[in-house]
Design a protein with these regions (language model features):
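Extended serine/threonine-enriched, polar tracts that run as long, contiguous segments within proteins
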Residues: 94-114
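C-terminal domain/tail detector
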Residues: 166-203
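Inter-helical turn/loop segments and adjacent helix faces that build the functional surface
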Residues: 32-40, 102-109, 171-175
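Short, charged, amphipathic alpha-helical segments
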Residues: 41-46, 112, 178-182
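Amphipathic alpha-helical protein-interaction segments
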Residues: 14-34, 40, 44-58, 95-96
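Structural signal for well-ordered, non-membrane alpha-helices
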Residues: 26, 97, 119-122, 161, ...
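Divalent-cation-assisted or electrostatically stabilized phosphate/pyrophosphate-binding catalytic cores
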Residues: 1-20, 49-91, 109-113, 134-172, ...
Length: 204
């Protein structure tokens, strides 16, 4: 409500998260424009270009990680015949590993490991969700190289998120720990579970 007082948590970490969101949005829009010529994405990228440039000046390491990972992924995905799924998965992990490190400190290695494992999980989960559309559009999908279908990915995805939660439980988190647990132990599975349930009903 506009007349009620609100408690907002704003600090250097929330500002950092907002900056990384801008950087990721910029590269995602430019990638969509390059791959599928989505003109609206190009316009949006242009509208946030100045903000992105400011972010890149503040966080060159992170923005370099995003651009290099996208370029590497593009090379992997375009070399369809020789594309190795594990390389694409690791590439996504490497990108997120750098974004999870705001600054170098005692916990940097743990945060890099957390980001790396989470990045791999997200990439494989997205691939599972996009499998049917990717085949229809003849897009690269690592599941094809793995000879797996989405419904056969549960064990691999469980192992990936298990690696994530193992590192998560060792981090010195105090605030909103229960919310993060809810996401990592349940929320990340919501769309996948719904998709599998719909498929079972359809073929059941």
């Amino acid at each position: 409500h506009p007349l009620h007082k609100k408690t907002e948590t704003e600090n250097k970490f929330t500002a950092y998260a907002a900056d990384m969101t801008i950087a990721l949005a910029y590269y995602k829009c430019m990638d969509d424009w390059k791959d599928e010529k989505k003109y609206l994405k190009r316009l949006y990228a242009e509208s946030i270009k100045k903000q992105y440039q400011e972010v890149a000046e503040k966080y060159p390491r992170q923005c370099k990680a995003i651009s290099e990972s996208i370029r590497e992924l593009e090379q992997i995905e375009n070399s369809t015949a020789d594309a190795k799924p594990d390389e694409a998965v690791k590439c996504s992990g490497k990108m997120l590993s750098e974004l999870f490190v705001y600054e170098e400190d005692f916990w940097s290695n743990s945060l890099r490991s957390f980001g790396f494992e989470l990045g791999q999980f997200i990439y494989l989960m997205d691939a599972s969700m996009d499998y049917k559309e990717d085949i229809r559009k003849h897009n690269y999908n690592p599941l094809i190289g793995m000879n797996k279908k989405p419904e056969e990915m549960k064990e691999i995805l469980t192992m990936c998120i298990g690696n994530v939660t193992q590192i998560f439980e060792k981090l010195p988190l105090v605030q909103d720990q229960h919310l993060l647990r809810n996401i990592l132990y349940g929320g990340v599975w919501q769309k996948y579970s719904e998709k599998m349930q719909r498929k079972e009903k359809k073929h059941g």
